[in-house]
């Protein structure tokens, strides 16, 4: 799958333009998804120097993205007159999701088992349903 991942508020705490503290298990989960052959795209509002800082921050923690703010590494805005900021990703992981950002353990479970929120809620409801007398 192609997975677009936001930076501020998703991988690190939201301190833009500074880089916030790492969100627990974000890097571990993303590296694990890469080992399972998912393509990760960093999808951020950051540009220029601020974007370079975010990419370096991730690289220093062992996370190298397939592409950054584009669909594929070779894509060049100046050579593409129909360039769109909208990615062709299968999944978007972003703190601005409806319902907010789940914890990274839940994100991994949803991606690896291809579960929707509805599937996940149904699963947890059945697991925690009290026994009837």
Language-model segments: what does each one mean?
Residues 51-133:
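C-terminal cap/substrate-recognition subdomain and adjoining C-terminal extension
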Residues 1-73:
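Alpha-helical substrate-recognition element adjacent to the catalytic core
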